[in-house]
Amino acid sequence: MLYELIGLVRITNSNAPKLEAKELSSTIGKLIIQNRGVVRDIVPMGIRYLPKIMKKDQEKHFRAYHFLMLFDSSAAVQSEILRTLKKDPRVIRSSIVKVDLDKQLDRASSLHRSLGKKSILELVNEDYQSI
């Protein structure tokens, strides 16, 4: 089944804001691959201010590094990933959404679909033509 993970990662070092998000996404990716899953795409969305001050583990956060991950896995692995994310102190908020694959197997992430791209193949062809 295809899932989409949206994560908000804390920023501890202003000089290297991507560091913890990169470590977290590689940890989650390894967990998916070890359990016979496939990571389709990781979309870094950059640093954004949060709509309100959020608390996690007695820390207050007003901005976070956002990322989106598109992956295939079983339902058991998906719930294990969510459990791991809830325990991780680097994660401020996370959400996993099941992507509907009724008519199309090559599905882009919700972020890319909002920009008008319908499949990952369209994104790859666009990147290839720009080179």
Swiss-Prot record:
The protein's location, in the record's own words, is: Mitochondrion
A Pfam family:
Ribosomal_S6
- Biological process per Gene Ontology, one example term: mitochondrial translation
| One GO location term (cellular component) | mitochondrion
Check the UniProt entry and state the signal peptide residues, or none. none
| InterPro entries cross-referenced by the UniProt entry | Ribosomal_bS6, Ribosomal_bS6_sf, Transl_elong_EF1B/ribsomal_bS6
Q: What is its main location?
A: mitochondrion
Q: What keywords does the record list, in alphabetical order?
A: Mitochondrion, Ribonucleoprotein, Ribosomal protein
- Gene Ontology molecular-function annotations: small ribosomal subunit rRNA binding; structural constituent of ribosome
What does the UniProt function comment say about this protein?
Component of the mitochondrial ribosome (mitoribosome), a dedicated translation machinery responsible for the synthesis of mitochondrial genome-encoded proteins, including at least some of the essential transmembrane subunits of the mitochondrial respiratory chain. The mitoribosomes are attached to the mitochondrial inner membrane and translation products are cotranslationally integrated into the membrane.
Q: Which family does it belong to?
A: Belongs to the bacterial ribosomal protein bS6 family.
PANTHER family recorded = MITOCHONDRIAL 28S RIBOSOMAL PROTEIN S6, SMALL RIBOSOMAL SUBUNIT PROTEIN BS6M
Subunit and partners = Component of the mitochondrial small ribosomal subunit (mt-SSU). Mature yeast 74S mitochondrial ribosomes consist of a small (37S) and a large (54S) subunit. The 37S small subunit contains a 15S ribosomal RNA (15S mt-rRNA) and 34 different proteins. The 54S large subunit contains a 21S rRNA (21S mt-rRNA) and 46 different proteins.
Put simply, this protein is called: Small ribosomal subunit protein bS6m
